[in-house]
Amino acid sequence: MEDTNSLIEQRQAKLAALQAKGIQPFMNKFTPDRGCGEARASLKAWFEAKQTDPASTVGLAEGTAVMIAGRITAHRDMGKSQFLDLKDVSGRIQIYAQKQTLGDEQFDIFRHLDLADFIGVEGTLFMTRAGEPSLKVEKFTILGKALRPPPAKWEGLADTEIRYRQRYLDLIANDDVKSVFLKRSAIVREIRAFFHERGYVEVETPVMQAIPGGAAAQPFITKHNALGCDFYLRIALELYHKRLLVGGVDRLFEIGKNFRNEGLSPRHNPEFTMLEAYQAFGDYETMMETVESLVKRVALSAVGSLKVYHPRPTKTRLEVEFGATLLGEGKVPDYLEKRFGGELLNARGCLVEFDSASFGKAEPFELAASAHAVVSHVLQVISDHIMGDVVTFDEGSAELEFINELEGNVQRLEELSKRRVIDLEKWERRRYKDLVTAKVAEVSQGLVPAWFSISPQERRRVAIEVLELGGDIAAGYEDFEVTGAVFEKLIEPTLINPTFVTHLPKELVPLAKLSPDDPTTVEVFECCINGQEISPGYTEQNDPIAQRDVLEHQAGGEQQKLDEDFLVALEHGMPPAGGIGIGIDRLCMMLLGQESIRDVILFPQLKPKV
């Protein structure tokens, strides 16, 4: 295989040759009249309709002239004719070029096009004998010459860091990834439509703030040179939205970036997209209905169903994770290759291409299950051979390492073949204290039946010694934080179907109103789906005196932490209101079957390369 530098040099030489002929391979403009996938689908629809109704006018007929543009993703040289696959965001189409049609000079240029080049094509549609919708090239224009080769399917996509750091390569090679981000865009568009239809006004509030507020989080700090003072990137949208409620904007929402200078995890990114919405004269009950209606609508729009599956492996993910290495091809120890060559050869034949014709229409779960069966069989044959005392292998031998690798592949394939069904039709409501009490009683095997009736000191002891949460409870944790650790570690991960957890401890949400029936709690909900919080919401505190007392207590006497302008705004009078926040990234993770927040953010934060 040629190294990358050699391939780059070859492409640069082709560029120089084109320019020497007076060809400019970096055009300013080209105007296609339709997409590649659109042209292919339309011709296919015409062809299929003609089989049953010769008079049908559905689609584009053979012989229709079209102009398309896209990236070359496949190139097959047949001598005096060339077949290329051209692809854009709408899909792909096969294009066919003949020396007889283009002439010697143009055909020679066409033959030297490279994978990943952008070209514009004019020609006529036709169906091949094999029934493949195609375009016969009559004229072509090089629009953008690629000076680097595309990544090899197995090598370029197997490196997760390359996928995140060079997302453009991921999008070029992986249709599943592109689909995720197109659907994310559709989700955000549907959210906006939902709120506009309900009479909400979309607003924009400051990203740089003199005092970060609305959440307990570490902010990023920046300096405003002209004003000569520090500013903070916002950690929440809330306080400016409440100013707008004071100003008479009764229904408002914003979709924007928040920034928190905290840790990275599969669920956390320092820069994330947040939706916040507020409705005057509503409360937390009002906002629960809003969240449920919104999520159902978006799910039906983006996924087409109220049932969502997790995790959702894609064909590309299966190819990347396993591919040709699923059975250790190229590194099988000699003894195993000789002894089990037949089984390995047959198995590889089943696994060469997950997206080949035999697997083309299968669901990813079915592909994983099929691969699991194949690899399990090979492992079983080898294991039976060893168990029969036919042969033994030394510890650390290549043979044992290979067998251990097979066992790991079997286990991962088994996980990929499992479905977790999230039913968005069923929404529950559970009180926070009830959930915690029941879980503690269950885990302690009845030793602690009434968590909230024992002393704070005893709660800490039980959490550490009985519930085994010592690693999650810091020495300085207050009592409500100890209970919070119990909820986050033992309860939240079990809430798969949508669950509104209500009446949280008042210390957790200082900007919410107290519950009339239990003054130790607030009128708050956390909407949990698939084991993580998707949306908090609550009845907003509109009493300026009560709000000042809570915020002063929270600030601990540090006056600079108080947002006096916000408190003054409340003193001008704010209507009762309900508010919600929904993490767009987590919502997309849930709806699109992604296990990491980085898989729904185009360019997630990574440590810069040195």
Predicted feature residues:
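Surface-exposed helix-capping loop/turn segments at secondary-structure junctions
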Residues: E197-E202, L300-Y309
